[in-house]
C-alpha cells in the first residue's frame, strides 16, 4: 500500500492555510449538505480528470465521513503519483465539530 499520513483537523487546517488541496469522497448529497470550505467532491466519475489535471506535488488532504474510507482513497491517490497525501482523522464530522466556520454548502466549490 502506498504511503500517506493520518492527520488531525488542526493539522489539516494548517496545511489548508498553506495551499493544500482538499478532496471529499463522500456521496454527492452529503457533500452538498456540508463540506470543508474550498474542498472538491471526488468520486469515480471525476477521479480520472482530477488526477490528470492535479499538481502531484501539492499537498492533498482526503476527507470522508469519519476518517475510515479516506485512508483507502489516500493510499490509492499516493499510488497514482501524489507525493504528499493525508487522510483526515475523524473525517468531515470531526472537522465540522472543530471548525464549524470553515464549512460550506452546495454541490460545487
UniProtKB/Swiss-Prot annotation:
Keywords: Cytoplasm, Transferase. It comes from Ectopseudomonas mendocina (strain ymp) (Pseudomonas mendocina). InterPro entries: GlpE_sulfurtransferase, Rhodanese-like_dom, Rhodanese-like_dom_sf, Thiosulf_sulfurTrfase. Pfam families: Rhodanese. Residues 16-104 form the Rhodanese domain. GO terms for biological process: glycerol metabolic process. Transferase that catalyzes the transfer of sulfur from thiosulfate to thiophilic acceptors such as cyanide or dithiols. May function in a CysM-independent thiosulfate assimilation pathway by catalyzing the conversion of thiosulfate to sulfite, which can then be used for L-cysteine biosynthesis. GO terms for cellular component: cytoplasm. Belongs to the GlpE family. It is an enzyme of class 2 (transferase). This is Thiosulfate sulfurtransferase GlpE. It is found in: Cytoplasm. One of its GO terms (molecular function) is thiosulfate-cyanide sulfurtransferase activity. The active site is at residue 64. It catalyses: thiosulfate + hydrogen cyanide = thiocyanate + sulfite + 2 H(+); thiosulfate + [thioredoxin]-dithiol = [thioredoxin]-disulfide + hydrogen sulfide + sulfite + 2 H(+). It comes from the Bacteria. Its EC number is 2.8.1.1.
Amino acid at each position: 500500500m502506498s504511503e500517506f499520513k493520518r492527520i488531525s483537523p488542526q493539522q489539516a487546517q494548517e496545511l489548508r492555510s498553506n495551499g493544500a488541496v482538499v478532496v471529499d469522497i463522500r456521496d454527492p448529497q452529503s457533500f452538498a449538505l456540508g463540506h470543508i470550505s474550498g474542498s472538491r467532491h471526488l468520486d469515480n466519475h471525476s477521479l480520472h480528470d482530477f488526477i490528470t489535471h492535479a499538481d502531484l506535488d501539492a499537498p492533498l488532504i482526503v476527507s470522508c465521513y469519519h476518517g475510515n474510507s479516506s485512508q483507502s482513497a489516500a493510499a490509492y491517490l499516493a499510488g497514482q503519483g501524489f507525493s504528499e497525501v493525508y487522510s483526515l482523522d475523524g473525517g468531515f464530522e470531526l472537522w465540522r465539530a472543530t471548525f464549524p466556520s470553515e464549512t460550506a454548502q452546495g454541490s460545487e466549490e
